[in-house]
Each structure stands twice: as C-alpha cells, then as structure tokens.
Amino acid sequence: MDARKEGLLRKPRFSAQPRVGMGLLPFFLACAVYLLVRNADQPPWVNVLLKILPVLYLAGFLGTAHPGGGYRALLQGALLCSAVGDACLVWPEALRYGMAAFGLAHLLYLRAFGLTPLKPGLLLPLLLVSALYFRVLHPHMPPQVVWPLLAYSIVLVAMLWRGLARGGSAHWGALLFVLSDSVLAWNIFTYLVPHGHLLVMTTYYSAQMLITLSAFQNPRLKSH
C-alpha cells in the first residue's frame, strides 16, 4: 500500500456536500445571541430558549447530512437529550435531572461512535485522570449527588474513549465536551473560574458542533 492510500485510511475527509459551512451560520448566530443576551434577571424560560436554540438547530441541521442512517439519528437523539439537560441546568435544583439527560446523550453518542477500532489502551489513562479529578471534587459535593455524578463521569469517560478512537471531528468534539463539563463541575462544586460560564458554553457549543460535523465526514476506509 503506498503512502497516499495509507493517508486515506488515517484521515477522515468531509464529504463533498455543498454549503455545510454556510449552513452553520445560524448556529453561530444563535450561540452569539445567547452569550450576549443571557441575563440572570430575565425570566428563566427566556434563558432556556436562548440556551437550547443552538443545539436544536444542530439537530435539524443533521437532517441535511447524506447518507443519513443510524449514525445521524443517534446524534440527533443525543442533541435533543442535551437540550433537555441544558434546560434543567438553568435551575440549580434540577441538577440531577440535567445529569440524567446528558448521561443519556452520552450513551447515544457512545452507541453512535461504535467499538471499531477498539483502542483499549486509551481507556485506562482516561479512567485514571477522571478518578483523580473526581477525588478532588468529592469533598465539595453534596452527598445526594455523589453517586449520580460518579455514574455520569463513567459514561462521560466512555464517550470520550470512543470519540477519540473514532477520530476526525468527533475526536475534538469529545475532548471539548469533557473540558466543558470539567469546568462546569468546578464552578458548581468548588469556586467560580474567571469567565467560567463563557468558557463552559463556548467549549460546549463547539463540542456539539464538531460531533455534528462528524456525520458529514466520509466513512473511513478499512484495510483487510
């Protein structure tokens, strides 16, 4: 196999679908509106609507991906679950419901990313780093969220493992999702990171966009 063919195996390419970039302009606009207009003094339903619009747009945008199939449907389901989680997190008392919704979203992403290639060597380092971070946060957590957050963390790490193994934009989307959740957990359970909300939301929206874009990439060729 020559180097050019080998490169095709390693590097997923975006399908030749027109105006994918232009199709994301409403998403970027919705993100900007939320970040600029969001205000704690507004009625909660206004902030909920502004917050979930970018993610709902991505779910609709996935309808333009060809071919469609199960991968696209799983991503759309994950985005809809994420929108429910986003809405729940507007109210601090609904944190556990938000974790449940996002946990389901990650299970759908996990199913979409699949188990091929397996790359088991990635899993242990990810589990170790996650366990260390959880141990740092643990003394600051209310007792009622310890077990739900532990379960959520395991699902999140599994999603990251499969996203990294899949490669392409899903790789970077999974990484940014974990970064966003890590900063959010620090903000909630320890102390506020400077500009923490901006960091959480920009990494979160970027993560969802990159995972969405993985549906527009050509399937990777496999060698036998």
Swiss-Prot record:
UniProt keyword Transmembrane helix present: yes
Disulfide bonds: none
Transmembrane residue ranges: 20-37, 45-65, 73-91, 98-114, 121-137, 145-161, 172-189, 198-216
Activity control note: Competitively inhibited by lysophosphatidic acid.
A Pfam family of this chain: YhhN
Membrane side Cytoplasmic: residue ranges: 1-19, 66-72, 115-120, 162-171, 217-224
Catalytic reactions of this protein: a 1-O-(1Z-alkenyl)-sn-glycero-3-phosphocholine + H2O = a 2,3-saturated aldehyde + sn-glycerol 3-phosphocholine; a 1-O-(1Z-alkenyl)-sn-glycero-3-phosphoethanolamine + H2O = a 2,3-saturated aldehyde + sn-glycero-3-phosphoethanolamine
InterPro entries: TMEM86B-like
GO MF term list: alkenylglycerophosphocholine hydrolase activity; D-lysine 5,6-aminomutase activity
Enzyme Commission number(s) from the entry: 3.3.2.2
Keywords: Cytoplasm, Endoplasmic reticulum, Hydrolase, Lipid metabolism, Membrane, Transmembrane, Transmembrane helix
Extracellular-side positions: 38-44, 92-97, 138-144, 190-197
GO biological process annotation, one example: ether lipid metabolic process
Protein location: Endoplasmic reticulum membrane; Cytoplasm
Broad class of where this protein is predominantly found: endoplasmic reticulum
Top-level division of the source organism's lineage: Eukaryota
Record-level GO cellular component terms: cytoplasm; endoplasmic reticulum membrane; membrane
Topology of this chain in the membrane: Multi-pass membrane protein
Subunit comment: Homodimer.
Assigned protein family: Belongs to the TMEM86 family.
PANTHER family documented for this protein: GH04784P, LYSOPLASMALOGENASE
Function per UniProt: Catalyzes the hydrolysis of the vinyl ether bond of choline or ethanolamine lysoplasmalogens, forming fatty aldehyde and glycerophosphocholine or glycerophosphoethanolamine, respectively and is specific for the sn-2-deacylated (lyso) form of plasmalogen.
Full protein name: Lysoplasmalogenase TMEM86B
